[in-house]
Swiss-Prot record:
Function as written in the Swiss-Prot or TrEMBL entry: Chemoattractant for blood monocytes, memory T-helper cells and eosinophils. Causes the release of histamine from basophils and activates eosinophils. May activate several chemokine receptors including CCR1, CCR3, CCR4 and CCR5. May also be an agonist of the G protein-coupled receptor GPR75. Together with GPR75, may play a role in neuron survival through activation of a downstream signaling pathway involving the PI3, Akt and MAP kinases. By activating GPR75 may also play a role in insulin secretion by islet cells.
Name the record gives this protein: C-C motif chemokine 5
SMART domains, per the entry: SCY
Highest taxon in the source lineage: Eukaryota
Pfam families found in the cross-reference section: IL8
Subcellular location: Secreted
Lineage: Eukaryota, Metazoa, Chordata, Craniata, Vertebrata
Species assigned in the record: Felis catus
């Protein structure tokens, strides 16, 4: 009985010092990925900022953040995304 209690204490101590890989600062990529694009242009007055998704994502995308803090995925190949969305935010 004493051996199993000691073994349990050692395992518990070892588990306390183990950290998951996701807790590492090198693995903390929190950039969202997109799985569908917006089908129509957004009004420019609704846009506050934008960012690109990570290269680790399966679909490249521009994520527009609206004034209400909603994140909307858009196709970076679309003309309205480049010319109206991104350019208008860069001008401000």
């Amino acid at each position: 009985m004493k051996v199993s209690t000691a073994a349990f204490a050692v395992l518990l101590t070892a588990a306390a010092f183990c950290t998951p890989a996701s807790a590492s600062p090198y693995a903390s990529d929190t950039t969202p990925c997109c799985f569908a694009y917006l089908s129509h242009p957004l009004p420019l007055t609704h846009l506050q900022e934008y960012f690109y998704t990570s290269s680790k994502c399966s679909m490249p995308a521009v994520v527009f953040v609206t004034r209400r803090k909603r994140q909307v995925c858009a196709n970076p190949q679309k003309k309205w995304v480049r010319d109206k969305g991104i350019n208008s935010l860069e001008m401000n």
